[in-house]
């Protein structure tokens, strides 16, 4: 049943075009530009090249990855049509879903969901973060991040606290990885991060996560999705969606998924993000 579900269902600006992709050798094929943000630990040239090649062959045209250092930059590129698709945070998606088309969501540990983690240094005695981190130093990742910014501020607001006055000082790290390292190095007393990123960093750099401790794991939220501008042709959107959905059944796709720590991609309904919409309604009021 799980297999059927899968079938149905701070970094410098950079564009990776690469060579060796059969689709890229076709004369006259304009590349499909796919945006990525630092939320994903895919800053490895070999993996990006393999993924680019897989997607290009699957959709029959070359693919470029366009990387930017903030969610807002990628969102702006999407809304202006300067990228054809992107893997974005769910918070920008729900704020602009009238102008975006939802293609697919990653499947992580069997579900299209992830959790936010509230972390502190390993030897910190924090047990109740809302009480114990008051007046201390805190790291936020990106102003448009649900797990790394909006959610902890929402929790404080719902608890009757002023998010702008709760901490003595807060910093923006511009990536969950940077936030985790800031906590590990005791540059800050706590941070709220994407649990998927923490889990992946535990796998590839356990010496970093070992110097942190998870105080709180949030309820599940819809995993950051793959989206396109609403104006992208339906034919291109369909081909791209099918390429993502087929990854779990293709040997090359399986290798990429393993490196990403994902089970696959699935078609999902916009209602997956209703809880995020409710938070956005409160935070943007």
Where do the language-model regions lie?
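Acidic, polar ligand-binding/catalytic clefts
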Residues: 3, 76-132, 153
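N-terminal export signals
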Residues: 4-24
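N-terminal, post-signal-peptide region of Sec/Tat-exported proteins
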Residues: 50, 54-86
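Ligand-binding clefts/hinges and TM-proximal coupling segments of bilobed small-molecule sensing domains
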Residues: 62, 140-158, 242-284
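Short helices/loops that flank or line small-molecule/ion binding pockets
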Residues: 72-86, 131, 175-196
């Amino acid at each position: 049943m799980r297999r059927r579900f899968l079938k149905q269902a701070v970094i410098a600006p950079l564009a990776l075009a690469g060579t060796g992709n059969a689709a890229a050798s076709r004369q006259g094929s304009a590349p499909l530009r796919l945006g990525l943000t630092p939320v994903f630990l895919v800053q490895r040239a070999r993996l990006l090249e393999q993924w680019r090649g897989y997607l290009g062959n699957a959709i029959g045209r070359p693919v470029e990855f366009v990387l930017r250092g903030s969610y807002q930059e990628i969102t702006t590129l999407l809304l202006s049509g300067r990228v054809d698709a992107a893997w974005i945070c769910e918070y920008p998606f729900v704020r602009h879903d009238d102008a975006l088309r939802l293609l697919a969501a990653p499947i992580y540990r069997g579900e299209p969901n992830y959790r936010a983690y509230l972390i502190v240094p390993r030897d910190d005695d924090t047990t109740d973060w809302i009480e114990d981190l008051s007046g201390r130093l805190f790291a936020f990742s990106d102003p448009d991040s649900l797990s790394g910014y909006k959610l902890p501020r929402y929790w404080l607001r719902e608890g009757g606290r002023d998010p702008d006055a709760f901490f003595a000082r807060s910093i923006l790290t511009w990536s969950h990885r940077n936030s985790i390292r800031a906590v590990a190095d005791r540059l800050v007393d706590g941070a709220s991060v994407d649990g998927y990123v923490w889990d992946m960093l535990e796998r590839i750099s356990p010496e970093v996560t070992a110097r942190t401790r998870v105080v709180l794991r949030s309820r599940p939220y819809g995993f950051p999705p793959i989206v396109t501008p609403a104006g992208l042709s339906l034919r291109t959107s369909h081909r791209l969606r099918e390429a993502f959905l087929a990854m779990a059944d293709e040997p090359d796709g399986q290798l990429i998924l393993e490196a990403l720590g994902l089970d696959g991609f699935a078609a999902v309904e916009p209602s997956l993000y209703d809880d995020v919409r409710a938070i956005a309604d409160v935070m943007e009021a």
